[in-house]
Regions:
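N-terminal amphipathic/basic-hydrophobic helices that include classical n-h-c signal peptides
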Residues: 1-16
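Bacterial N-terminal signal peptides that target proteins for export
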Residues: 14-24
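N-terminal signal peptide c-region/cleavage motif recognized by signal peptidases
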Residues: 33-34
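N-terminal alpha-helical modules
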Residues: 38-175
Length: 175
């Protein structure tokens, strides 16, 4: 913080806060605000959507969007809370991916589980690479602040995990 003193009839102190202090305030607000309950149920929401007939990639994306909807509905001025919500949803979905791969390895032929594992790995890697690309472009060329960019990246990562989980779940049903 920078303190600037001005002499007048009464002493005035102007405090200019740096972005780090603003981030600290946002984190403090997050600490007293609960993560949206539905973010904790991202996997359940996605499973419910996937239990319906899914025929296209667009329908998969709709299911993933429904799973992370509580995070999407966070106001624009709550970027830190939204980013945390997306990270929690991603964590739930990543746990589902791990469990799904364990189930697949236990129930499918080695060739099938190896094929699905390789496809899944590259689905995730290509998605995360696009998230990094979008972040780098936003930092270099946009007027968004750091928190908004982190929110976008967290959303992208949660969507990547959601799509990977959805594809794995559907592949598991085929075998």
């Amino acid at each position: 913080m920078v303190y600037q003193m001005q002499e007048q009839s009464d002493l005035k102190v102007e405090i200019i806060m740096k972005p780090i202090a603003v981030s600290a305030i946002a984190v403090g607000i997050w600490l007293i605000s609960p993560v949206p309950v539905a973010a904790q149920d991202a996997r359940e929401t996605l499973n419910a959507c996937l239990s319906e007939r899914i025929e296209t990639e667009a329908q998969l994306l709709d299911c993933v969007s429904a799973a992370i909807e509580p995070c999407l509905s966070e106001p624009d001025d709550m970027n830190a809370v939204a980013a945390l919500c997306f990270r929690e949803a991603r964590s739930q979905l990543d746990a589902g991916i791990s469990a799904g791969m364990s189930d697949l390895r236990a129930s499918a032929y080695d060739e099938i589980s190896t094929l699905v594992s390789i496809e899944l790995k590259y689905d995730i890697l290509s998605g995360l690479l696009q998230c990094d690309r979008m972040e780098e472009l936003a930092v270099a060329l946009s007027e968004y602040d750091a928190e908004a960019i982190q929110r976008q990246k967290a959303q992208c990562q949660a969507t990547t995990s959601g799509l990977a989980y959805a594809r794995l779940t559907l592949r598991g049903r085929e075998n």
